[in-house]
A protein has these predicted regions:
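Conserved beta-strand-loop-alpha-helix hinge in the C-terminal portion
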Residues: 219-237
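ABC family nucleotide-binding domain
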Residues: 6-8, 13-209, 214-215
Length: 237
C-alpha cells in the first residue's frame, strides 16, 4: 500500500571510477527518499549515472561515501556476507537482458530464486498472474522476448521482495511488448505492494510513476512527486 512511510532512503551517495587523471566522478552526493509502495522512475541520458545508482542501492557495487537504507536496514553498513544474503533474500532485480538459464524451463528459472525466500509466492498463482502458466514447461528460446522478460520479473517477484530494481526493463523490447511489460509491472506493484525503482532513458515511462528522479552529470537535477500518475496502458511514445 502506498503511503508516506520512507522505504528507500539514500543520503549523500557518491561513486567514482579510476584514479588520477583517469578519475571519473559518476555520482556526486545523491540524496532522495522513496516511500513504501511507490513506483519511482529515474531518468537521464546515457552516462549520467543511472545504472551505477541502481547498482549501489542494490548492493551490487560499493559506494565511496553516503548511505543506503531499505526498509530500515542500512545496507552500506553491512558486511559483504550479510549484504549478499540480504540482497538475495529481500531485493528483486530486473535487467534489460534477461540472463535466463537456457537449459531451464520458464518455471524452473523462477524456482531457482524461490528457495531464497522464507515466504515465496505460490508458484502457480504467480505464473498465472504473469501470463506464463501455459508456457511454464517451455525453454526461454521457445518463447518471445516479452515472455522472457515476464519470466525475469517473475524471478524477481517470487521471493516476495519489498523492493524491485529495474534497469532498462523494456530497452530490448518493441513498443507493444514494452507496454505489456509496463502494465504487468503496474499490476505487480498494485497487487503485491512492492516498491519499484525503474531506471530508463524513456521519459514517457515517468508518467506512470509516483516519483520521478532525473540525473544529470552525476547529480540529482530533479526529484519530483507525480500527483497524477497515468495507467501504463495510456503511455505513448
Amino acid at each position: 500500500m502506498k503511503g508516506n512511510t520512507p522505504y528507500l532512503v539514500v543520503n549523500d551517495l557518491k561513486k567514482h571510477y579510476g584514479d588520477g587523471e583517469a578519475r571519473i566522478q559518476v555520482l556526486s552526493g545523491i540524496t532522495t527518499t522513496v516511500n513504501r509502495g511507490e513506483v519511482c522512475v529515474m531518468l537521464g541520458p546515457s552516462g549520467s549515472g543511472k545504472s551505477t545508482f541502481l547498482n549501489l542501492i542494490g548492493g551490487l557495487e560499493n559506494a565511496d561515501g553516503g548511505t543506503v537504507s531499505v526498509g530500515g536496514c542500512e545496507l552500506t553498513s553491512l558486511s559483504s556476507k550479510d549484504l549478499g544474503e540480504y540482497r538475495r533474500r529481500e531485493l528483486g532485480f530486473v535487467f534489460q537482458f534477461y540472463n535466463l538459464g537456457p537449459d531451464l524451463t520458464i518455471k524452473e528459472n523462477i524456482e531457482v530464486t524461490a528457495h531464497l525466500s522464507a515466504n515465496p509466492l505460490p508458484m502457480e498463482d504467480l505464473l498465472r498472474s504473469l501470463g506464463l502458466w501455459e508456457h511454464r514447461n517451455k525453454f526461454p528460446r521457445q518463447v518471445s522476448g516479452g515472455q522472457q522478460q515476464r519470466c525475469a520479473i517473475g524471478r524477481a517477484l517470487v521471493k516476495n521482495p519489498g523492493l524491485i530494481l529495474c534497469d532498462e526493463p523494456t530497452g530490448a523490447l518493441d513498443y507493444k511488448t514494452s507496454k505489456e511489460v509496463l502494465e504487468l509491472m503496474e499490476r505487480v506493484n498494485r497487487e503485491y505492494g512492492c516498491t519499484i525503482v525503474i531506471v530508463t532513458h524513456n521519459a514517457a515511462i515517468a508518467r506512470m510513476a509516483n516519483r520521478v528522479l532525473r540525473l544529470r552529470d552525476g547529480r540529482l537535477a530533479e526529484d519530483e512527486v507525480n500527483e497524477s500518475p497515468v495507467s501504463a496502458s495510456e503511455l505513448d511514445w
